[in-house]
Amino acid sequence: MSVDMTKWCEIAKANMGKRPAGEGRLGGKICIVTGAAQGFGKGIAEELYKEGATIVIADMNEPLAKQVAEEMGKRAVSIAVNVSDEESVANMVAQTVEKFGGLDLMLSNAGVVRSGPLAHVEKKDFDFVTSVNYTGFFLCAKYAAIIMEAEHEADPEAMFDIVTLNSKSGLEGSNKNFAYAGSKFGGIGLTQSFALELCAYNIKVNAVCPGNFLDGPLWSDPVRGLFVQYLDCLLYTSP
């Protein structure tokens, strides 16, 4: 069941045209970046901040997210979120509107990976990847769009963005990494479908499909990173 966002829509509408412009190319823009406590998300959030945006560092790792926000500066705050949980995502968006008065950019970056041969990947791992990478993007886009559509009603000239950090694995298959690739292929379908629907509200929806970021947690995490998971795969293929 959807979370009622009526209160937050009214607040966002009332604040259109009243928010301070700020300095820089993104001065006055309010941005949520999920999975922003480390890796790609952190780097993106830092660059947006440098351009003048107000940033929400949204992440499950609340202590690290708080640290990143504090290091970034006064225009950054941290909010704990589980992108696979609808109420958590709705609360993240509501808190953003409560703190800053609206939302201009949702950057859905949070992602996980579980790799392995088809016969050995368990359903719980497949479901976990799907819930974060695919369903998580749906939920972030849904609740961002609810606010942005209300803001569009107040100011039909305003422009908004929803961006997902997809992957090269959303463009071609990935050997023994099908759960991740499948979720990213699905994300491309969501992106194109959302874009067709939301353009009527001046909401642009796009996906960025980067290659491997070997220093990021998806690869380098010592317990669940892809380096470790691919080494584990050798156990299944060695004679």
Where are these regions (language model features)?
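Canonical Rossmann dinucleotide-binding motif of NAD(H)/NADP(H)-dependent dehydrogenases/reductases
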Residues: P20-T54
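Substrate-binding pocket helix/loop in short-chain dehydrogenase/reductase
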Residues: P117-L118, E122-D127
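Active-site loop-to-helix junction immediately N-terminal to the catalytic Tyr of the SDR YXXXK motif
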Residues: V121, G173-A181, S193
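Active-site helix of classical SDR
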Residues: A141, S183, T191
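Alpha-helical segment proximal to the catalytic Tyr-Lys
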Residues: I146, L196-E197
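Residue(s) in the substrate-gating loop at a strand-loop-helix junction
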Residues: S167
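Conserved small/polar residues in nucleotide/adenosyl-binding loops
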Residues: Y236-P239
